[in-house]
Amino acid sequence: MAVMPPRTLLLLLSGALALTQTWAGSHSMRYFFTSVSRPGRGEPRFIAVGYVDDTQFVRFDSDAASQRMEPRAPWIEQEGPEYWDEETRSAKAHSQTDRVDLGTLRGYYNQSEDGSHTIQIMYGCDVGSDGRFLRGYRQDAYDGKDYIALNEDLRSWTAADMAAQITKRKWEAAHAAEQRRAYLEGTCVEWLRRYLENGKETLQRTDPPKTHMTHHPISDHEATLRCWALGFYPAEITLTWQRDGEDQTQDTELVETRPAGDGTFQKWAAVVVPSGEEQRYTCHVQHEGLPKPLTLRWEPSSQPTIPIVGIIAGLVLLGAVITGAVVAAVMWRRKSSDRKGGSYTQAASSDSAQGSDVSLTACKV
């Protein structure tokens, strides 16, 4: 009988331990890859980031001096040198696959060599509160538009256009969906359980939102009421407005949840109301960190507990340090969040140095 390598055994044991535990709600692991061609300026730039829930834990940038996958969360730093070697090797392999794919896709779309083009990939898995597999994802985009996605059954593909049909036929012939499914239901889940255990103080915490309301006159007849939620984790939150108890969904301006730069999140929802009728409107906040939903109503004497200028300044500073390509990837992720996708990687093997995003022999587009 073959002897199981120590690292693989450790991963399996951590997975078995995780199945004896329960967590609040579901959890996810996601990888986001972005490749941007730079005609006349050398190789495409490749950026890879990994997230567990809403926390970034690894990052690779082909333009960085280190040329290594780097930790972005304290709990991942405990992984040994073999882990980082494998994660780096996988990222570099993906970058080379994307370099070839950028040229192939340019040909599919009959594009010249002069312009810059972008490939974006998202893949990952979700587990339930019992640590068992819920769903997997794989989505690809080209130049900011959907290209091909693994369907919810993890057995078939949806192609967005005629060019993507070519890729679909290639991947079907190579049985790519079966390989992705094996990774998503196996290795992805095992590593996610391990990360949730190792990073439980961060990943399994709940920080309730700090809430307040602001009032912004528009004219003599109208004003904007804005309901703020700040400093919360995890990112999932619900803000709703009601007028005399009736939902005002259609009339609500709602921004996407934004990172605050300190590991927590921010969000606001606003409605335009007739002057003098502010008391008829209530904001309702639901979050995992709250024992029960909060209800806020504008009081003329109420003041924001956190200056709005400070919030805006924080968001501007955050934006200055985020790479444009990663922002594009996250924006595309949110745009595509209602669809199911999948993976670019493989199931657990006997490779003792295996990482959580170990790559397959790549299926090119």
UniProtKB/Swiss-Prot annotation:
Annotated stretches, region: Disordered: 339-360
Disulfide bonds: C125-C188, C227-C283
Annotated GO MF terms: peptide antigen binding; signaling receptor binding
Region Alpha-2, annotated ranges: 115-206
Gene3D superfamilies for the chain: Immunoglobulins (2.60.40.10), MHC class I-like antigen recognition-like (3.30.500.10)
Top-level taxon: Eukaryota
GO biological process, one term: positive regulation of T cell mediated cytotoxicity
Cytoplasmic side: 333-365
Assigned keywords, A-Z: Disulfide bond, Glycoprotein, Immunity, Membrane, MHC I, Phosphoprotein, Signal, Transmembrane, Transmembrane helix
SUPFAM superfamilies from the UniProt entry: Immunoglobulin (SSF48726), MHC antigen-recognition domain (SSF54452)
Positions of the Ig-like C1-type domain: 209-295
Designated name of the protein: Patr class I histocompatibility antigen, A-2 alpha chain
Organism per entry: Pan troglodytes (Chimpanzee)
